[in-house]
Curated annotation (Swiss-Prot):
Residues 5-222 form the Radical SAM core domain. Pfam families: Fer4_12, Mob_synth_C, Radical_SAM. Catalyzes the cyclization of GTP to (8S)-3',8-cyclo-7,8-dihydroguanosine 5'-triphosphate. [4Fe-4S] cluster 1 binds at C21, C25, C28. GTP binds at R14, R65, T96, K157, R258, I259, R260. Keywords: 4Fe-4S, GTP-binding, Iron, Iron-sulfur, Lyase, Metal-binding, Molybdenum cofactor biosynthesis, Nucleotide-binding, S-adenosyl-L-methionine. Its cofactor is [4Fe-4S] cluster. Monomer and homodimer. Belongs to the radical SAM superfamily. MoaA family. It catalyses: GTP + AH2 + S-adenosyl-L-methionine = (8S)-3',8-cyclo-7,8-dihydroguanosine 5'-triphosphate + 5'-deoxyadenosine + L-methionine + A + H(+). It comes from Aquifex aeolicus (strain VF5). GO terms for biological process: Mo-molybdopterin cofactor biosynthetic process. This is GTP 3',8-cyclase.
Length: 320
């Protein structure tokens, strides 16, 4: 088994398929229209992705999550999923999306081998949502596609980043809404990923604050948590679930078994990394991956208060 310096195994590969997105969420994407995104010719091809996934599977990876940017901007997404689904050792393929372009491609994604979908929804209020994503989004259509995905047999979850003073007044509304839909909602503490989001700890709504608020309206119980789980999960009395990803106040670095591959072929051993490792141009890719992982000692979230405010990779380049 391939282990890093803290004896953590490599089990999950997150692939950013593009750094582009149709939205401009304040906590993720650069503002304005002039940002110099990667030219399409520099993006990993389906053939390259398949080649790399085969190597990662050989080294112990069992799960692949496709992210962005917005992965549905890739016209060859279905081909990519189909290729990954045929790789021996890969047990699960998931997709993270804002859901805007999902409706027309659900069936094809299912046929290609996609098993799980996570949709990002940060507000139920159209005006407030527009302030966050800086685009007009038909939330009704996003909710409809979530329901449709569930009907087609996808395992569906919703992620909501909670920011103090912005959408923390919607915590119970979000919980109530997705509980009624029978969809697992995961609240995410506002994180200091990258440098474009003007992050400050005062904007963080902690897991404890969320739980104390939830207890005022709902009865629920904690579910067992494995060291590698990112989410603290809870079950309501009716069997529906919700979770909290508390990277800021309750770090889970010690169990982190994930590596990230950017859209142009660079490996990042942590969401908060300040540099990537160029897999694309490595001659012996298998040994390159081994050495990168063996040398890994990241635990940024555990050391956040001790770390310097150095420039970190932006979220839209490596996925959340």
């Amino acid at each position: 088994m391939l282990l890093d310096k803290l004896s953590r195994p490599l089990k999950v590969l997150r692939i950013s398929l593009t750094d582009r997105c149709n939205l401009r969420c304040n906590f993720c994407m650069p503002p304005g229209k002039e940002y110099n995104f990667l030219p399409k010719r520099q993006l990993l091809t389906p053939e390259e992705i398949e080649e790399y996934v085969k190597i990662f599977a050989k080294l112990g990876v069992e799960k692949v999550r496709l992210t962005g940017g917005e992965p549905l901007l890739r016209e060859d997404l279905e081909e990519i999923i189909q290729r990954i689904s045929k790789v021996e050792g890969i047990k699960d393929i998931a997709l993270t999306t804002n859901g805007v372009f999902l409706k027309e491609r659900l069936k094809a994604l299912k046929e290609a081998g996609l098993k799980r979908i996570t949709v990002s929804v940060h507000s139920l209020n159209p005006e407030k949502n527009q302030k966050l994503v800086n685009r007009s989004v038909n939330l009704g259509e996003v909710f409809e596609v979530i329901i449709r995905a569930k009907e087609l047999g996808f395992k569906v979850k919703v992620n909501s980043v909670i920011i103090k003073g912005f959408n923390d007044d919607e915590i119970l509304d979000l919980a109530r809404f997705f509980k009624n839909l029978g969809v697992t909602l995961r609240f995410i503490e506002y994180m200091d990923v990258g440098t474009v989001n003007d992050w400050d700890f005062s904007k963080v709504v902690s897991a404890d604050e969320i739980l104390n608020l939830m207890k005022k309206e709902f009865t629920f119980y904690p579910l067992p948590k494995r060291p590698e789980d990112t989410s603290m999960d809870f079950i309501y009395e009716d069997g529906n679930k919700f979770g909290i990803i508390a990277s800021v106040t309750k770090p889970f670095c010690r169990g982190c078994n994930r590596i990230r591959l950017s859209a142009d072929g660079k490996l990042y051993t942590c969401l908060f990394s300040d540099k990537g490792h160029d897999l694309r141009n490595a001659v012996d890719k298998e040994n390159f991956i081994k050495e990168v992982w063996k040398d890994r000692k990241d635990r940024y979230s555990e050391l956040r208060r001790q770390m310097k405010r150095e420039r970190k990779v932006e979220m839209f380049k490596v996925g959340g």
